[in-house]
Structures are given as C-alpha cells and as structure tokens.
Design a protein with these regions (language model features):
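Structural and coupling elements of P-loop NTPases
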Residues: 3-10, 15-715
Length: 715
C-alpha cells in the first residue's frame, strides 16, 4: 500500500464581484482557456452555468429549461433547448482568469466545436452519469487530441437515480485506455450521493446547504458496494503520476509517498504531455463537486504560457516559432466570427503573443492588408464588457474589424501566419428559393454574411439545374440557417430536394435534313442544311463542316453552329442538356435573296430535333465517387444500403482510425439526397463521407419513363 502525505487545501474559493474579473489585467501565466465539449445532452451548458455561479461570476444559476442560461442566449438555442453556437464567458478562480468556451454537442454544429476547441488550452469533456460514453464523447476527445489539447472528463448528472459512476468509469478506461485517472469520485448509497472523495487530498466531503464539509472516508464495505476501492484508486493516482517524471518514478518505486504538491504537479504535467486524462464528477443542479472542479482548474489545467511555441509561417514561407511572451510583437488568430446586422461583425480572437490594442494598425497576414483593431470587449454570454487591451494567451472580441475566421493578424515588425482550422465539409444539400419574388438578392447578401460566420455552410448556383444550393452539415443545421435568414435578416425561404442534373445523348449516327422556308410577301426566309449527327466523347458540342461546291455559303456556317449550340441546351426526351454530340454540316442549299443567318439558325434547329429523334436518344444520370467511413460493426449494413441505392462497391480498406472501415463505391447522385441523415442514424454519428460527381452513365431503362414524365418538355 502506498502512503500519501496529505496537505490540507481549503475548499472555499475567493468570491469575485460580479463583472470585476473583466476589469483586471491578467498575465499569460494567470489565464486558462477551457472548452467544454461532449455528447449533446451531457450537461455542458449546465456545467458552464454552475462554474460561473459557484465562482461568483454570476449572481444566479440559470436553467436550460427556463431559457435563461448565460451561454445559450440566442432565440434558436432557447427554442431548441440546446447549444447551437460556441459561446464565451469568463470567471475567476484563485489567481486565474478562466475563459470558458461552451461548445455545441449536436453533430450538425460540429464547426462551432472545432472553433471552441481550437481556441482552448484544455478541454473538459462532459460524460452523463446516466448515458455514459457516447459518440459525442469520442468526437470531442478525438478533436482535442488532433489539436494537441489536454483533456479532462467530467462525469455529470450524478443526481439522476439511474446514474452509475462505476459503469461510466469502466467505460472510460475501456474506451480511452490507461491514461484515464480518476481524481474525484462520488460515494453513493441507495442511489444517492452522500459525499465526494478527493483522491489527491485523500479526504471526503459532504455538502450541507451547498457548502463542502469534511466527513469520514467511506469504509471498505461501502467501497465494495460501489464497485471501486478507494484505496486502490488512490494508489492508481500515484502510479499515474510516477510515469510523468523520472525522479517521481524512482521515488514511487522506492516506497516513498508523494506530497500533495507532487501529485498535483505530476497530474498537471501528465495532462500537458497527454499521458494523464483526469476524471472528476459534479452535479450541476445542486452544485456539489463544482467547487472541487474549480480547484482542479486552478491546480491541474495548464495556462497558455506553458504551451509549446506555436509554429507559424513567415511571408517567405519559412517556419517560425511564436512563444506566448507579452514583450514580443503581437500575433493573434481569428477563430470565430459572428455576423450581427445590428452591432456589426464580431471577431473572436485568441492572442498568441504580444498585446492586442484597440485603434492600432495591424497586418492581416492571411490577406496582406493593413487593418485597424476595433473596440475590444470580453463577453459574458451576450453581455459585452469593454477591455483596454488583451495580453497574450487571452481571448477577446474585436468589434467591426475587417477580418474573417482563420485570419492571422500581427504586428508589422513580425509578419507571421498560423495554419487555418480544418472544418467538416457540408454534405447535406437542399435547393433554396425566396418565398417573395424579388428577395433573391437579399438571400445572397444574407448568405454572404452567414458564410463569413459559419465555414461549414455553402451557398452557390448549380449551373446545370439553375438552382441555388444550400449545403449544411445536416437537417438541424439547415433549419438553423433558414431560421437565421428569417429572424436575423428578414428573408423567408423555401427548401426542396435539389434537381438531378441529368443529360441526354445519342447512340447511333444519322444524317438528316433541316429546312426552313417561309414566304409572307416581300423577302422570305430560306435555309436548308444536311447534318450528320454522331456520338462522341466531348461534353460540349463538336461542330465541323464538310460542304463542297458552295452548297451553303461559308458566311452562314457560324449561324448553323449557333443554332446547334442553342439547341443542345435542351434534349428531346426531357429537356436536359445534350452531351457527347458531334455535328457535321455536309450539304444544303440557299437562296440568294431569302437566305439569312436567322434562316440557317432555324434550319439547324430543325435538323437537330429530327436528328436526335432518329439517333436513339438516351438519358444519362450523374454518377458520384463515394468514400464512406463507418464503424466495423456497420460495414455489412452499409454494403446493403449501397446496393439498395444502385451503388457499385469498388473496395474496402481499414481506416487510420481504429475500429473504422472505408468503403469506396460509385453511386448515382439521384440516390444520395438523404444519405447524410441515413449515415448519421446508422452509425450514431460516427460515419463520415465524401462524395463527388465523377461521370455520366445511361439511366436504367426501368427508371427512364418516370424521369421523362417528371421533366417532359413541349415539342
């Protein structure tokens, strides 16, 4: 048994005056930037609310059900009762200013989570004590690790009768490996939390009137009923700390006990290096355990000053290290944008070095332009508080500044650019049209603003169908964008499944005549052409002339070609553009008075229609290349689904991510309208895919009649 020397640390926190935190200047060693991420519904916003209230940063404990939380304040969030956007708030614990970035857990809003985690120095991943580890838990953890962020699991909702901390802890260890290290655990009797054990202090605390009071440690009998031995967990903490430092390793195996400072410093170091992921627990409703979490934030989580130097790129493309040093030239990164039509653009900025000062000119290293820094504010949810400057390591919002998400701004004495964040690509596509005629320009202007704000949406014209296509990450994301258009920009739109850009072509060579003759007094109209039509591999019309003896004067050749170019925009089957068509003008006749360019254009159009009918026209459908990643357990289901969608599976490969398989296939685009939603449902959000148009193939005969009926055009 390892004996640990216990140094008592009081649990009471200095209470900050409401808003006082925003008036102080914080050194980079005294700032902590924390993203709160995890599965939707796992308690992220409630935890944010509890931390703010318990620290004294707010004077009331908001509730999601009441729509009065600090971080979920937009109409969309209040209506949905979940986070849609990453919000910024701050508190003070000990000597530290803590910036909290409450991120959405819904997969449709993953872009917001990317921004929040990118700006953070550490990620608290909430795990419901009732639901346990879910797909969103893995997504948050994977995002954090991809960006090199230390992580801590916070088990929430332990006041629920169906919560089971032991099951969750077992899941965490199984899913995330030996780095998982509990530091605070609940003592549960009759499905109720009676106290919490701080494994670092080796003390138990119960809560009376919201205050922690030291109580007896649980007996061995109680520990066994809970499913975990307290003494075993305490020893596991020491074992984890021993792995962080050679001197600690030697001390551990010599049988010496660690001091409490050695334990906290060791966990702190282990978090920085990624070999320790602490697990703690709270109840955000009665606030039990929240004061312990505040202390863990104080003692365990790293400030920006401890982070390795950022690697940037100079104007010459050379790598440069940028350390978090306030005396160095300023450099900062725009990680989020809010497009507010009333207050203007709000740019969320993380300062990496130096100081960001209002009204000072800086270089936008991404665009090369010079910009003036706008007014700086910090946020407490929607509340804005002016700040005089922002030191390195801090997060602020610049008002009305001409910069965009992923831009780097810096001092002209050291121009440096940081790598942009990588966002998931929007794959859920819907056609959008204005409800009111004449609002099209308003939609375009509003979407331009929204695309500045959200890099996971796209809005552009599909020239093949002449529809405006809005691409998002899913149905909820689409609803949010449509809601913003109406609520924020006053433009109502309708959405529909995008049209499929079918094409038409021919299968055999024919020779036809096109003759246009009209006499109505005075000059008439006369144009006569013989044209050979044959299949070819070009997407565009291929036009040639092989006229001998001047049967058609050369000056009318362009008119014939123009008539054909206009005609191939609509096929004879269902009005789709024609591809793979070669036209050779071989003969014809003309009238010295009545022939004109217009007459020969008409003659070419007549020849085209007759030639298409005789040349066995067929419909072509677009085929896309699909690369879809699914959990190994879903491989069979996905193969069956692709077969239902007329897909051709080309191969399967083990993915880089353990437990995932890549399936490569070709699938008709007409079968992919709901694939985003199907994949999310099948894989509980774990699946991802890319899909790009590859080529056209003949539409199966059994589907032709239906497509023609829906798209038939008048002769």
């Amino acid at each position: 048994m390892i004996h640990i020397i216990i140094l008592h640390i009081t649990l009471s926190r200095p209470t900050a005056k409401i808003g006082a935190i925003n008036l102080k200047k914080y050194d980079s060693t005294k700032i902590k930037n924390i993203a709160i991420a995890g599965q939707a519904g796992s308690g992220k916003t409630s935890l944010t609310e509890a931390l703010l209230y318990k620290s004294g940063a707010t004077d009331r404990l908001g509730k999601i059900t009441d729509g009065n939380t600090v971080s979920d304040y937009t109409p969309d969030e209040i209506k949905r009762k979940c986070s849609v956007y990453t919000s910024l708030s701050s508190l003070e614990t000990g000597e530290f200013k803590v910036n909290l970035l409450d991120t959405p857990g819904m997969f449709d809003y993953e872009g917001e989570a990317v921004e929040g985690i990118a700006a953070s120095g550490c990620v608290l991943i909430t795990v419901s004590g009732k639901s346990g580890v879910r797909v969103g838990t893995h997504k948050a953890y994977d995002l954090a690790k991809e960006m090199g962020k230390p992580t801590m699991f916070v088990v929430t909702k332990l006041d629920d009768d169906n919560a089971n901390f032991n099951n969750v802890l077992t899941q965490l260890k199984a899913e995330f490996g030996p780095t998982v290290c509990p530091v605070v655990v609940p003592v549960i009797a009759d499905r109720k939390i009676v106290s919490y054990v701080n494994l670092i202090e080796m003390k138990a605390y119960k809560y009376e009137d919201g205050k922690a009071v030291e109580t007896d440690m649980p007996t061995a009998e109680v520990s066994e009923k809970m499913g975990y031995r307290i003494d075993g967990l305490i020893e596991a903490v020491s074992e984890a700390v021993a792995e962080t430092d050679e001197a600690l390793f030697e001390k551990f195996f010599s049988g010496e006990a660690f001091t409490q400072k050695e334990l906290t410093d060791g966990i702190h170091s282990g978090m920085n290096s990624g070999i320790i992921t602490p697990v703690t627990c709270v109840s955000s409703t009665d606030l039990s355990g929240v004061d312990m979490l505040l202390k863990e934030i104080d003692l365990l989580l790293p400030p920006p000053s401890e982070k390795d130097a950022m690697i940037g790129e100079t104007a010459d493309g050379e790598a440069v290290e940028v350390a978090c040093v306030e005396s160095d030239p300023m450099s900062a990164f725009v990680f989020k944008t809010v497009a507010d039509p009333f207050v203007g653009k709000m740019s969320y900025i993380k300062v990496f070095s130096g100081k960001l000062i209002p009204n000072k000119e800086v270089v936008n290293a991404t665009t090369g332009s010079t910009e003036k820094v706008g007014k700086l504010v910090t946020l407490q949810g929607k509340k804005q508080i002016d700040v005089a400057e922002a030191g390195c390591g801090d997060i602020v919002v610049a008002m009305k500044m001409n910069v965009n998400t992923n831009d780097t701004i810096c001092d002209s004495t050291r121009v440096v650019k940081f790598a942009p964040m990588t966002f998931p690509k929007p794959c859920y596509k819907m056609a959008v049209r204005a409800k009111k005629q004449g609002d099209e320009s308003k939609i375009s202007a509003a979407m331009t603003r929204l695309m500045e704000e959200d890099l996971t949406i796209d809005y552009k014209l599909d020239p093949s169908t002449n529809e405006m296509i809005l691409s998002t990450l899913g149905g909820l994301h689409l609803d949010s964008v449509v809601g913003r258009l109406a609520g924020t920009f006053g433009v109502e739109v309708e959405t529909s499944v995008p049209k499929i850009s079918y094409r038409e072509t021919i299968r055999k060579k024919v020779k036809v005549q096109g003759r246009h003759k009209k006499q109505s007094g005075g000059h008439g109209q006369y144009g006569d052409v013989w044209i050979e039509f044959e299949p070819c591999v070009s997407d565009d019309l291929v036009f040639e002339e092989k006229v001998f003896g001047g049967a058609v004067p050369k000056n009318f050749f362009p008119a014939v070609e123009k008539g054909l170019q206009e005609s191939v925009k609509k096929g004879v089957l269902a009005g789709f553009p024609v591809v793979g068509l070669k036209a050779i003008l071989v003969d014809g006749s003309y009238h010295p008075v009545d022939s004109s360019e217009m007459a020969f254009k008409m003659a070419a159009s007549i020849a085209y229609k007759e030639g298409m009918r005789q040349a066995e026209p067929v419909l072509l459908e677009p085929i896309g290349s699909l690369s879809v990643f699914v959990p190994d357990d879903n491989t069979g289901d996905m193969m069956g689904e692709l077969n239902k969608r007329r897909g051709r599976v080309l191969g399967m490969n083990p993915a880089e991510k353990k437990g995932m398989t890549e399936i490569v296939a070709e699938v008709p685009m007409a079968e992919m309208a709901d694939f985003t939603l199907l994949l999310r449902q099948m894989t509980q959000g774990q699946g991802v895919f890319t899909f790009e148009k590859a080529r056209y193939e003949p539409l199966p005969a059994n589907l032709v009649a239906d497509v023609i009926a829906k798209n038939a055009v008048a002769d």
